[in-house]
UniProtKB/Swiss-Prot annotation:
Belongs to the TonB family. GO terms for biological process: protein transport; siderophore transport; transmembrane transport. It comes from the Bacteria. It is found in: Cell inner membrane. It is a single-pass membrane protein. It comes from Pasteurella multocida (strain Pm70). Residues 30-256 are periplasmic. This is Protein TonB. Residues 89-112, 121-132 have a biased composition (Basic and acidic residues). Interacts with outer membrane receptor proteins that carry out high-affinity binding and energy dependent uptake into the periplasmic space of specific substrates. It could act to transduce energy from the cytoplasmic membrane to specific energy-requiring processes in the outer membrane, resulting in the release into the periplasm of ligands bound by these outer membrane proteins. The gene is tonB.
Length: 256
């Protein structure tokens, strides 16, 4: 709008300038006729040219303003009115997640039962027969051990009961020494000592009721001596004059 009004004003000024210039030229050409027409004619012609120029300027129509773009109002979303006669559907309950199926345990195989051995039928023997059987077993054991003692040169009788007792004691101590084991911990700590073990001997030479009668001061050494006596085997029947209660010293010494 502003550019168009400026162009119209510029055009009017240019037209006025050219009209003035044309009238000036016309005035020079008609200078000689001024005397005849007089000064009033010049004024009239100039006045006419100015009116013509103004008329041309007024005849130009003013440019119409451009119409503003129509404002489009955004359509508001229509609110849906709930029908009171229609009942709303109840909301669906969310489905519960299915629990994962547990893997089925394989049935455990039952251990096969071992076939039971048939028990030997024990006949009820009278007391007299039982005593006979026990006496016979004792006699058999005595004979076998007796054979062992006769083969042992240390237990052969020399006609003196004292010598037989001493020989039996020496053989008994050697049997205990065979089963003696020095405890590793006691050896590392360089523990030493002598343990006296007292035990009972029956007529067949079987050891029982072993106990510590004198300690070495070390529990490990005492237990090792007691185990050695309990592991000793019978060396034969007791000789005449040999007591049933016997005490044997068991020595633990470290030799470099």
């Amino acid at each position: 709008m502003i550019d168009k009004s400026r162009s119209c004003i510029g055009f009017a000024i240019s037209l006025l300038f050219h009209a003035s210039f044309v009238s000036f030229l016309y005035w020079i050409v008609q200078k000689d006729d001024d005397s005849a027409n007089g000064f009033a004619a010049d004024i009239i012609s100039t006045h006419i040219s100015m009116e013509m120029l103004a008329a041309t300027v007024l005849e130009e129509p003013e440019p119409e303003p451009e119409p503003a773009p129509p404002v489009v109002e955004p359509e508001l979303p229509k609110e849906e009115v709930a029908d009171p006669t229609v009942k709303p559907e109840p909301p669906k309950e969310p489905e519960k997640p299915k629990e994962p199926e547990k893997p089925k345990e394989k049935p455990k195989e039952k251990p096969k039962e071992k076939p039971k051995k048939p028990k030997k039928e024990q006949r009820d023997l009278p007391k007299s027969d039982r005593q006979i059987d026990s006496n016979s077993s004792i006699n058999q054991q005595a004979t076998t051990t007796g054979n062992i003692t006769t083969n042992n040169p240390n237990l052969v009788g020399k006609g003196n009961s004292t010598d037989e007792v001493n020989a039996y004691r020496s053989a008994l101590r050697r049997e205990i020494e065979k089963h003696k084991r020095y405890p590793n911990r006691a050896r590392m700590m360089r523990k030493q000592g002598v343990v006296t073990i007292t035990f009972h001997l029956n007529n067949a030479g079987v050891i029982s009721n072993a106990r510590i009668s004198k300690s070495s001061g070390s529990e490990e050494l005492d237990n090792a001596a007691l185990v050695a006596v309990n592991n000793a085997r019978p060396i034969g029947p007791l000789p005449a004059g040999m007591p049933n209660e016997v005490s044997v010293p068991v020595s633990f010494r470290i030799t470099n």
